[in-house]
């Protein structure tokens, strides 16, 4: 008895603490009331989803549920087929344009204008992230182009303002004045350069650009190569004695052809040059061809006016050395490279030059024959200056002493050469 009394006393003492800590220890009526209050509170905040018990559902309800699932699946399949047929009938270019317009309305970085080729390139992108990156690239490119245009217009306006201030008032009022020198209009300059280009096509020395490297370049590198070709053609057109330019291995409908037609536009058919799908081997004899490549072991000493020089239209940013040299060897052609180490203190880096730099060097060699003048078109960031001329004269004397023709020179000619080289150094 005393043990039972002690246990009852302890239970009555601990009961209020248990009610506070654990609500489930309440009486049955209070527990039911607590649960109903919680259900009403939760139902007002979040709609509760009730899942039927599979064991309690009768078989008739299970059959109706299965029928509903079958009908829903069939309707979804019909919708997929209809959307697939509609997507096939719809133009993919129009769908891509709609996607771009939707992204523009959402405030994403999308260009305002883009060409058909850029749209086709966007269609070839597989994932959404690649499409987004490509559109961002076009957006940044368009913004940079607009910024350059604005900067160019501002510079032009700044240059024109002081010129207007320097002109007298009589000239400002009436532009038709008599001057000492005849004014050359742009139309007259175009006619003069056209005559020179026509003469070069008939009597000029050929210069061939090998266009068979479009498979070795990425689209961005090919665009860079076309920009260099445009610069080369303009430099040749403005020269006193231009080359007769050949674009050999130019496939009609190829990447090079499309980009050139896109850049030139209507002027492409009016250019005074020869564009052909034939190879340079089919047009000229192999004995008169010299392929210029930086990988050649043969160093170019002088410019030969009776030879036909070939320049590979290849922008190599992926470091593919020996590509043009291998092609020249495969065709059994003579190769040469520019004497950069002989005249320049070359620093680290490749000796590949751009197409417009090669054009300027060859034009200068053709007109002057001076390597010192021609190699001024090599970028100064690639070398540390010219070598001393006395070093070349000493090398020349050493070669002449070793050769058999040293004794055939008249007396005093070697000394005169030394004195002249010393005077040049002074």
From Swiss-Prot:
<keyword id="KW-0597">Phosphoprotein</keyword>
<keyword id="KW-0808">Transferase</keyword>
<keyword id="KW-0489">Methyltransferase</keyword>
<keyword id="KW-1135">Mitochondrion nucleoid</keyword>
<keyword id="KW-0175">Coiled coil</keyword>
<keyword id="KW-0809">Transit peptide</keyword>
<keyword id="KW-0819">tRNA processing</keyword>
<dbReference type="GO" id="GO:0070901">
    <property type="term" value="P:mitochondrial tRNA methylation"/>
</dbReference>
<dbReference type="GO" id="GO:0043527">
    <property type="term" value="C:tRNA methyltransferase complex"/>
</dbReference>
<dbReference type="GO" id="GO:0090646">
    <property type="term" value="P:mitochondrial tRNA processing"/>
</dbReference>
<dbReference type="Pfam" id="PF01746">
    <property type="entry name" value="tRNA_m1G_MT"/>
</dbReference>
<keyword id="KW-0496">Mitochondrion</keyword>
<dbReference type="GO" id="GO:0097745">
    <property type="term" value="P:mitochondrial tRNA 5'-end processing"/>
</dbReference>
<dbReference type="GO" id="GO:0000049">
    <property type="term" value="F:tRNA binding"/>
</dbReference>
<dbReference type="InterPro" id="IPR007356">
    <property type="entry name" value="tRNA_m1G_MeTrfase_euk"/>
</dbReference>
<protein>
    <recommendedName>
        <fullName>tRNA methyltransferase 10 homolog C</fullName>
        <ecNumber>2.1.1.-</ecNumber>
        <ecNumber>2.1.1.218</ecNumber>
        <ecNumber>2.1.1.221</ecNumber>
    </recommendedName>
</protein>
<dbReference type="GO" id="GO:0000964">
    <property type="term" value="P:mitochondrial RNA 5'-end processing"/>
</dbReference>
<dbReference type="InterPro" id="IPR028564">
    <property type="entry name" value="MT_TRM10-typ"/>
</dbReference>
<feature type="transit peptide" description="Mitochondrion">
    <location>
        <begin position="1"/>
        <end position="41"/>
    </location>
</feature>
<dbReference type="GO" id="GO:0070131">
    <property type="term" value="P:positive regulation of mitochondrial translation"/>
</dbReference>
<dbReference type="InterPro" id="IPR038459">
    <property type="entry name" value="MT_TRM10-typ_sf"/>
</dbReference>
<feature type="domain" description="SAM-dependent MTase TRM10-type">
    <location>
        <begin position="193"/>
        <end position="385"/>
    </location>
</feature>
<dbReference type="GO" id="GO:0160106">
    <property type="term" value="F:tRNA (adenine(9)-N1)-methyltransferase activity"/>
</dbReference>
<dbReference type="GO" id="GO:1990180">
    <property type="term" value="P:mitochondrial tRNA 3'-end processing"/>
</dbReference>
<dbReference type="GO" id="GO:0005654">
    <property type="term" value="C:nucleoplasm"/>
</dbReference>
<keyword id="KW-0949">S-adenosyl-L-methionine</keyword>
<dbReference type="InterPro" id="IPR016009">
    <property type="entry name" value="tRNA_MeTrfase_TRMD/TRM10"/>
</dbReference>
<dbReference type="GO" id="GO:0030678">
    <property type="term" value="C:mitochondrial ribonuclease P complex"/>
</dbReference>
<comment type="subunit">
    <text>Component of mitochondrial ribonuclease P, a complex composed of TRMT10C/MRPP1, HSD17B10/MRPP2 and PRORP/MRPP3. Interacts with HSD17B10/MRPP2; forming the MRPP1-MRPP2 subcomplex of the mitochondrial ribonuclease P complex. Interacts with GRSF1.</text>
</comment>
<dbReference type="GO" id="GO:0042645">
    <property type="term" value="C:mitochondrial nucleoid"/>
</dbReference>
<comment type="function">
    <text>Mitochondrial tRNA N(1)-methyltransferase involved in mitochondrial tRNA maturation. Component of mitochondrial ribonuclease P, a complex composed of TRMT10C/MRPP1, HSD17B10/MRPP2 and PRORP/MRPP3, which cleaves tRNA molecules in their 5'-ends. Together with HSD17B10/MRPP2, forms a subcomplex of the mitochondrial ribonuclease P, named MRPP1-MRPP2 subcomplex, which displays functions that are independent of the ribonuclease P activity.</text>
</comment>
<dbReference type="GO" id="GO:0042802">
    <property type="term" value="F:identical protein binding"/>
</dbReference>
<dbReference type="GO" id="GO:0052905">
    <property type="term" value="F:tRNA (guanosine(9)-N1)-methyltransferase activity"/>
</dbReference>
<comment type="similarity">
    <text>Belongs to the class IV-like SAM-binding methyltransferase superfamily. TRM10 family.</text>
</comment>
<feature type="coiled-coil region">
    <location>
        <begin position="138"/>
        <end position="166"/>
    </location>
</feature>
<dbReference type="GO" id="GO:0006397">
    <property type="term" value="P:mRNA processing"/>
</dbReference>
<dbReference type="GO" id="GO:0005739">
    <property type="term" value="C:mitochondrion"/>
</dbReference>
<dbReference type="InterPro" id="IPR025812">
    <property type="entry name" value="Trm10_C_MTase_dom"/>
</dbReference>
<dbReference type="GO" id="GO:0005634">
    <property type="term" value="C:nucleus"/>
</dbReference>
<feature type="modified residue" description="Phosphoserine">
    <location>
        <position position="86"/>
    </location>
</feature>
């Amino acid at each position: 008895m005393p043990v039972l009394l002690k246990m009852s006393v302890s239970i009555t003492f601990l009961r209020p603490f248990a009610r506070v800590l654990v609500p489930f220890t309440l009486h049955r009526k209070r527990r039911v009331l607590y649960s109903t209050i919680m259900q009403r509170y939760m139902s007002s905040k979040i709609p509760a989803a009730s899942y039927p018990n599979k064991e309690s559902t009768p078989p008739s309800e299970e059959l109706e549920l299965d029928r509903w699932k079958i009908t829903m699946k069939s309707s979804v399949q019909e919708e997929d087929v209809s959307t697939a047929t509609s997507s096939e009938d719809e133009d993919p270019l129009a769908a891509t344009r709609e996607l771009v317009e939707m992204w523009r309305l959402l405030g994403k970085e999308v260009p305002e204008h883009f060409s058909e080729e850029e749209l086709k390139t966007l269609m070839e992108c597989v994932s959404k992230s690649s499409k987004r990156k490509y559109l961002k690239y076009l957006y940044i490119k368009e913004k940079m182009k607009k910024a350059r245009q604005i900067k160019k217009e501002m510079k032009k306006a700044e240059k024109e303002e002081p010129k207007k201030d320097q002109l007298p008032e009589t000239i400002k009022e009436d532009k038709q004045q008599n001057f000492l020198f005849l004014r050359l209009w742009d139309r007259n300059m175009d006619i003069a350069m056209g005559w020179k280009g026509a003469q070069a096509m008939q009597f000029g020395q050929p210069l061939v650009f090998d266009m068979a490297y479009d498979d070795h370049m990425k689209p961005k590198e090919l665009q860079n190569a076309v920009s260099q070709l445009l610069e080369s053609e303009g430099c040749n057109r403005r020269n006193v004695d231009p080359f007769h330019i050949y674009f050999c291995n130019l496939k009609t409908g190829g990447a090079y052809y499309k980009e050139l037609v896109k850049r030139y536009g209507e002027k492409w058919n009016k250019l005074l040059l020869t564009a052909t799908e034939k190879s340079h081997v089919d047009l000229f004899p192999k004995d008169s061809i010299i392929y210029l490549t930086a990988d050649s072991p043969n160093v170019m000493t002088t410019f030969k006016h009776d030879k036909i020089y070939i320049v590979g239209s290849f922008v190599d940013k992926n470091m593919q050395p020996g590509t043009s040299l291998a092609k020249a060897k495969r065709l059994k052609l003579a190769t040469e490279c520019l004497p950069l180490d002989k005249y320049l203190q070359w620093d680290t880096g490749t000796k590949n030059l751009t197409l417009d730099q090669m054009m300027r060097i060859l034009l200068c060699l053709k007109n002057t024959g001076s390597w010192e003048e021609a190699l001024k078109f090599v970028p100064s960031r690639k070398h540390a200056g010219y070598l001393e001329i006395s070093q070349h004269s000493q090398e020349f004397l050493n070669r002449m002493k070793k050769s058999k023709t040293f004794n055939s020179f008249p007396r005093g000619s070697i000394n005169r050469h030394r004195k002249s080289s010393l005077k040049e150094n002074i």
